[in-house]
């Protein structure tokens, strides 16, 4: 793999998400590739995000201008690969094809297709299309490849650290996540918790506050408005007995946090029953709970994580993910 990517030119159009774009770039570069990284999305403020829901034309116009700038800045380069993990307008994709005709174009879908409006209409512009969702891979006849964990989660010094929490959760506050967290806290008040519930902006907080009673019952200090680094996520995981995962109700694919528990060698409590269909599933390490009536027995918290086969760690590592997408 290292020899294969050596000297390859890659244009990475990666929707920014807690620094994973930089981690992927750095890993590709460590394998010998020359990488140009851009956010797949034009920079918009909270007000513009709200406008986007009402007037999509405004957003697409801004997106096209943004990507035209990327193409003009790099038009003399002969990319071997162009990677995207976001929904790009068909006109934008046509222009990438025209500007970089020899590039292999790769799309990786890290959300459910139903949550990415129109993405299925863009498949024809890509040479390779992957999804993290097994059901979507079957429905749309595209390649299935779960997400990855980065190297920091396998840091042995962190793995052997002290345990401070029974259960920890780190994630964006969306859908019914807050109600499930509150329900678990009320039901199991004797457990030690760490919660990092990220809100993308104050605008989003007040939007939920006005419309949802659950948000009015929680002090605003509970929410975090600055994203957490991946190294800090790993540190919190290593100080926890179990990791709580609450996938979006419209998703069946496994979240990044779920895959990261493999690298961190941590047990997971999840609302996603599809985890039972994966090769790393072990009922000693995985507890599936109901969204409306979560049951978390003390016996699950105190049992030790059972190590997995070495091939599982290789498969779900960032190296394994890159190998499947680019090789």
Give, region by region, the residue ranges found by the protein language model:
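An amphipathic, basic-hydrophobic alpha-helix
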Residues: 58-78
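A short acidic/histidine/glycine-rich donor-binding loop in glycosyltransferase catalytic cores
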Residues: 283-289
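Active-site proximal beta-strand in glycosyltransferases
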Residues: 97-112, 130
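Short N-terminal targeting/anchoring amphipathic segment
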Residues: 12-13, 72-88, 106
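Short alpha-helix at the nucleotide-sugar/activated-sugar donor binding site of glycosyltransferases
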Residues: 261-262
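A charged, aromatic-enriched C-terminal amphipathic alpha-helix characteristic of glycosyltransferases
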Residues: 292-327
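Nucleotide-sugar donor-binding catalytic core of glycosyltransferases
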Residues: 2-64, 85-86, 91, 114, ...
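Short amphipathic alpha-helix with an adjacent loop that forms part of the alpha/beta core around
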Residues: 70-75, 156-158, 296-303
């Amino acid at each position: 793999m290292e020899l294969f990517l050596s000297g390859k030119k890659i244009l990475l159009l990666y929707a920014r998400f807690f620094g994973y774009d930089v981690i992927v770039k750095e890993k590709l570069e460590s394998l010998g590739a020359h990488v140009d990284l851009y956010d797949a999305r034009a920079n918009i403020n909270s007000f513009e995000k709200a406008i986007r829901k009402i007037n999509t034309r405004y957003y697409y116009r801004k997106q096209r201008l943004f990507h035209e700038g990327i193409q003009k800045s790099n038009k003399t380069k002969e990319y071997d690969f162009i990677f995207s993990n976001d929904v790009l307008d068909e006109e934008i994709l046509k222009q990438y094809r025209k500007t970089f005709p020899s590039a292999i174009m790769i799309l990786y879908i890290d959300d459910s297709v139903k949550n990415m409006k129109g993405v299925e209409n863009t498949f024809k512009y890509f040479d390779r299309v992957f999804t993290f969702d097994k059901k979507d891979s079957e429905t749309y006849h595209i390649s299935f490849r779960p997400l990855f964990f980065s190297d920091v989660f396998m840091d042995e010094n962190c793995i052997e650290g002290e345990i401070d929490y029974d259960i920890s959760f780190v994630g964006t506050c969306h859908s019914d996540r807050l109600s499930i967290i509150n329900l678990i806290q009320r039901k199991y008040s004797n457990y030690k918790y760490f919660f990092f519930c990220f809100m993308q902006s104050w605008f989003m907080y007040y939007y939920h506050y006005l419309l949802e009673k659950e948000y009015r019952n929680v002090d605003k200090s509970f929410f975090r408005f600055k994203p957490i680094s991946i190294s800090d996520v790993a540190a919190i995981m290593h100080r926890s007995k179990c990791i709580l995962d609450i996938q979006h109700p419209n998703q069946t694919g496994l979240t990044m946090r779920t895959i990261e528990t493999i690298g961190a060698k941590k047990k997971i409590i999840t609302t996603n029953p599809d985890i039972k269909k994966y090769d790393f599933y072990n009922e000693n390490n995985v507890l599936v709970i109901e969204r409306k009536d979560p049951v978390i027995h003390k016996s699950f918290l105190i049992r030790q994580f059972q190590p997995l086969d070495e091939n599982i760690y290789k498969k779900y590592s960032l190296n394994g993910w890159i190998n499947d997408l680019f090789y």
